[in-house]
């Protein structure tokens, strides 16, 4: 799986808005519709994969992703919430100007786009810090 910043933003928004179950159901439905049309789809895999990344990065707490080979997903949830870092990253990803700045910085420096770069680019975009 490749990291997809839009999917990560969707995951963080689902947590913030307390609609994890609805987001998972929507991903499952997209997969069902694609399969019924004879197409291959990985929406559920992508959503859970990015939820796992968010948990691993300390952006989300109270959510455990469970995998059952070959590709069955499940989860255990307690009090699911964004951490302060999760809120900060979500704010950065919502800022079109800041996110475009981060992409430009990463591209010009030939470095991968990281969480820290996204946050710093947002600060620069709003004039808080000069890079």
Question: Which functions belong to the PLM regions below?
Answer:
Residues 2-39:
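Short amphipathic alpha-helical interface segments
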Residues 65-92:
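Accessory beta->alpha helical hairpin/"wing" motif in late/C-terminal subdomains of nucleic-acid enzymes
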């Amino acid at each position: 799986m490749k990291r997809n910043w839009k999917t990560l933003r969707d995951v963080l928004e689902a947590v913030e808005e307390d609609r994890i179950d609805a987001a998972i159901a929507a991903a499952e439905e997209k997969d069902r519709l694609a399969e019924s049309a004879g197409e291959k789809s990985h929406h559920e895999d992508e959503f859970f994969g990015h939820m796992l990344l968010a948990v691993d990065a300390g952006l989300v707490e109270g959510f455990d992703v469970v995998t059952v080979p070959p590709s069955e997903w499940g989860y255990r949830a307690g009090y699911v919430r964004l951490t302060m870092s999760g809120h900060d990253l979500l704010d950065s990803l919502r800022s079109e100007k800041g996110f475009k700045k981060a992409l430009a910085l990463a591209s010009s420096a030939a470095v991968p786009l990281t969480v820290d770069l996204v946050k710093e680019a947002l600060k620069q975009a709003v004039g808080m810090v000069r890079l």
